[in-house]
């Protein structure tokens, strides 16, 4: 019974460690992205507008627009 308890606790610690590592890598990636954006010289509003524009689906080409 003690062995099962040790195994379960070990597995939980490993899962927690991996999720913590993944979160820190995600934070680091966001930080690097912000630094790259800062180096480009775009303001936050410009970057937000660019990201929103990229997120829109490309519709049909309408020459009247």
Curated annotation (Swiss-Prot):
Expressing tissues: Expressed by the venom gland.
Signal sequence, start to end: 1-24
Official protein name in the record: Peptide ToAcP
Known role: Helical wheel projections predict no hydrophobic face, suggesting a non-amphipathic peptide. Does not show antifungal activity.
Source organism, top-level taxon: Eukaryota
Propeptide: 25-34, 59-65
Major location category of this protein: secreted
Keywords: Amidation, Secreted, Signal
Organism field: Tityus obscurus
Keyword Signal in record: yes
Example of a GO cellular component annotation carried by this entry: extracellular region
Alanine amide modified-residue sites: 58
Subcellular location: Secreted
């Amino acid at each position: 019974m003690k062995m099962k308890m040790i195994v379960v606790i070990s597995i939980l610690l490993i899962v927690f460690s991996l999720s913590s590592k993944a979160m820190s890598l995600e934070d680091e990636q966001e930080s690097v992205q912000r630094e790259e954006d800062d180096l480009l010289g775009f303001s936050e509003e410009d970057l937000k507008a660019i990201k929103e524009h990229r997120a829109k689906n490309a519709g049909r080409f309408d020459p009247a627009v």
